[in-house]
């Protein structure tokens, strides 16, 4: 049985490379002890051997010089993904094709070798290197199928929205112009057509994928594009805000069923706003008010 020389705290806290083990004054055979697990060749851990875990990913980045990218970077940035991509089989690492690298065929690593400008990479304090949010959005376009374009639009919406914080809205993670710039610099890459189509439909103001999907469904059903984050009563500073709405529109009522007007206090339709059902479940809003879709404050 291999003796268990205690690990220094810098190594015991997470994953480490064999070179880091040697630098700490421990021999290679220490990796054979039962308290350590092998993530892949050259990387071990005292915890669960998961290359996608933060410490495992950081160690693999240090070992290979790669950059966390694609689906792995999307998860790091908190981007919504279709179910088939939400649990990647391995850690996606990108290596700049102009740089000399080694050990890119490791177990648990999905390697990509492409041009990767330095301004498309985030350098984190723990040694982690991750593609920027805008570059990650573009890289996802090469992994999504044409019928999944709505997910790419939702990812774009997610990045350009001003997110809620305890003190109000914050600056967005990326801007539409930043997405456009990355797209222009990645011409000829897989996914460029899908990214271009998605970018044309990215909007500021959608706070969740369901809001994006609803907007797209309305447009594709032949309805006008709704506004996002609309005050129900623009004249009232304290007015609630709805996710989607048609400001000042009056829906024509059905000619085959009488419209029944009612007063409603439900969210999105303030008391005193006259609404009607046209027999098909479609709301009829009085001009000067907002016909609300979705719920506000998300």
Please report, for each region that a protein language model flagged, where it lies by residue.
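Surface segments flanking catalytic/ligand-binding clefts of nucleic-acid enzymes
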Residues: 20, 25, 163-298
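Short gly/ser-rich loop at a beta-strand->alpha-helix junction or flexible surface loop bordering the NTP-binding
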Residues: 1-191
């Amino acid at each position: 049985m291999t003796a268990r020389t205690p690990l220094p705290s810098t190594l015991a806290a997470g994953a480490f490379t064999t070179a880091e083990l040697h630098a700490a004054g421990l021999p290679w055979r220490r990796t054979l002890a039962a308290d350590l697990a092998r993530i892949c060749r050259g990387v071990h851990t005292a915890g669960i051997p998961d290359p996608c875990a933060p410490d495992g990913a950081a160690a693999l980045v240090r070992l290979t010089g790669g950059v966390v990218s694609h689906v792995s970077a999307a998860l790091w940035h908190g981007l919504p993904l279709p179910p088939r991509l939400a649990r990647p089989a391995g850690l996606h690492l990108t290596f700049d094709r102009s740089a000399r690298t080694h050990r890119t065929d490791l177990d648990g690593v999905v390697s990509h070798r492409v041009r990767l400008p330095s301004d498309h990479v985030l350098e984190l304090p723990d040694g982690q290197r991750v593609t920027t949010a805008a570059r990650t959005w573009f890289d996802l376009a090469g992994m999504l199928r044409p019928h999944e374009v709505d997910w790419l639009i939702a990812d774009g919406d997610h990045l350009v929205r001003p997110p809620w914080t305890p003190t109000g809205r914050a600056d967005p993670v990326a801007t539409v112009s930043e997405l456009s710039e990355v797209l222009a610099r990645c011409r000829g890459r897989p996914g460029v057509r899908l990214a271009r189509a998605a970018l044309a439909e990215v909007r500021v103001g959608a706070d969740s994928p369901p809001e994006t999907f609803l907007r797209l469904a309305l447009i594709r059903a032949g309805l006008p594009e709704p506004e996002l984050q609309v005050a129900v009563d623009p004249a009232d500073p304290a007015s609630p805000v709805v996710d989607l709405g048609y400001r000042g529109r009056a829906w024509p009522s059905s000619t085959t069923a009488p419209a029944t007007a009612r007063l409603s206090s439900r969210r999105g339709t303030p008391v005193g706003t006259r609404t009607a059902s046209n027999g098909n479940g479609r709301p009829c809003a009085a001009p000067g008010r907002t016909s609300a879709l979705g719920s506000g404050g998300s």
